[in-house]
Amino acid sequence: MAKSHLLPWLLLLPILCGPGTAAAITYSLACAQGPEFWCQSLEQALQCRALGHCLQEVWGHVEADDLCQECENISRLLTKMAKEAIFQDSVRKFLEQECDVLPLKLLAPLCRHLLDTYFPLIIEHFQSHMNPKFICQHVGLCKPRHPEPGKGPEPWGPLLDKLALPLLPGVPQAKPGPQTQDLSEQLFPIPIPYCWLCRTLIKRIQAVIPKGVLAMTVAQVCHVVPLLVGGICQCLVERYSVILLDTLLGRMLPQLVCGLVLRCSSEDSAGPALPALGSVPGEWLPQDSDCQLCMFVTTQAGNSSEQATPQAMRQACLGTWLDRQKCERFVEENAPRLQTLVSSGWDAHMACQALGTCAAPFSPLQCVHSPHF
């Protein structure tokens, strides 16, 4: 009888202890390889208790190759997200709602048609064709590499073949531009600003992608190390994750999507070209208005109890200088995360940095400070 009660626990024991034990043994053996293995990633440095060595001897400065590697890592993460059915459904529903609230009602059916036609193709392309190395070369974070002998051209071709634009009259085919003037006038009473519409939808997609959550997920590993080292770890995460996510989402999506689907010029779809590697100008950082909105809402709710914080944030949106609709949308999307950060002792600026709406200057000497560092 005793055996029958003991058996389930014996079966559970490998599940509860096995992975951690096996991982510890694996890392113990791997750490014996020395610094070359320790400093390949933050996780390996922590597991081998060599974070201090890696910070001082290997990670002391941010080089162009570091940015390239981090860009590729984040691109793989975003591409993986694009493959998730739940994420696709959320983005699709969100964009359909955005189509319905466009200021010019005439554009709503066209916007829906744009989604119906091209959303599945773009998702399929990200799933099967998009290469992180190519993405990061395209946005200027990796140096261009010459194609290896025997390999085909860079992966614009497959999507361009599919997006022959058979269903969208009036799309510019030869000379790209912000509007479809002098095209398809017999079908639409006004020129249809396809590139503007594309840019508008792409910017709204960025609100669905949880930049702050992704950066905070990376930062979770910092909590398993001593406080001082944990603060340095948080500094590294701030330097890489949030800045690169802002860069990739703000520059990559308009260039890749609007440039491919509608042949919008880079000036129309993504603003000026990216600067050379090694410099990260202030324009890469989040817009001041978004940062100010986050700071204001968080500050106004800072003195409230944990239960009253969401209501206090919504009340803050009644401020006369705020865009109320934008503020309420921001609170709806971010209140739970902000509440968690504020209740943990983070001030408004730190919380908004972690959320991704505010960012510190990109400098090895200036990092976000957690309550413990």
Curated annotation (Swiss-Prot):
This is Pulmonary surfactant-associated protein B. Residues 64-146, 191-268, 287-362 form the Saposin B-type domain. The gene is SFTPB. InterPro entries: SAP_A, SapB_2, Saposin, Saposin-like, SaposinB_dom, Sphingo_Act-Surfact_Prot. Pulmonary surfactant consists of 90% lipid and 10% protein. There are 4 surfactant-associated proteins: 2 collagenous, carbohydrate-binding glycoproteins (SP-A and SP-D) and 2 small hydrophobic proteins (SP-B and SP-C). PROSITE patterns: SAP_A, SAP_B. GO terms for cellular component: alveolar lamellar body; extracellular space; lysosome; membrane; multivesicular body. It comes from Bos taurus (Bovine). Residues 24-64 form the Saposin A-type domain.
